[in-house]
Design a protein with these regions (language model features):
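Terminal, low-structured helical/coil segments at or just beyond the last alpha-helical repeat
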Residues: 9-18, 118-147
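Residue-level recognition of tetratricopeptide repeat
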Residues: 63, 97, 129-132
Length: 147
């Protein structure tokens, strides 16, 4: 969701949404490092992003996008149990969230729960979206294609 602030607003007023934006930038940078196989550096950025997401979440408990990124960053640093909790909390707010359904499916592939991954794929089947195609490929290749 977008936030609009009046021109006279104090910078501290909009810092909450900036945590989320900053976290997204860190995630993007971490993804680029991962592609270059700089995994340790990527994990550090994912951890930094997670800390910013926690701050964003503290003021926006009902934002499924923040929960999606919290799940994503947790999964990327190897904390699968925590990631699953964030994804499931996000789905309890917005069950048809394409990103959460895809990433939760990827987590299920990573943790050898293909039946559950296929359930997420089934939720996405009518979305006509990239998330469906990506999860379908990951399931078919058992995760040999990048998560």
């Amino acid at each position: 969701s977008q936030y609009v602030y009046s021109a006279g607003s104090d910078s501290s007023d909009d810092s909450k949404s900036n945590y989320y934006d900053d976290a997204k930038k860190l995630v993007k940078r971490a993804g680029k490092l991962e592609k270059k196989e700089k995994i340790d550096k990527a994990k550090k950025l994912y951890s930094q992003a997670f800390k910013k997401l926690e701050k964003a979440y503290s003021s926006e408990k009902k934002n499924p996008d923040i929960l999606n990124y919290m799940g994503y960053t947790s999964r990327k640093i190897g904390n699968f149990e925590q990631a699953e909790k964030f994804y499931l909390t996000g789905l309890s707010i917005k069950p048809d969230h394409n990103g959460i359904n895809e990433y939760l499916g990827e987590l299920y592939v990573q943790t050898n729960r293909l039946d559950k991954a296929n359930e997420r794929l089934d939720v996405l089947k009518n979305c006509n979206c990239e998330e469906y195609k990506e999860l379908e490929l990951i399931i078919k290749t058992r995760g040999s294609k990048v998560y």
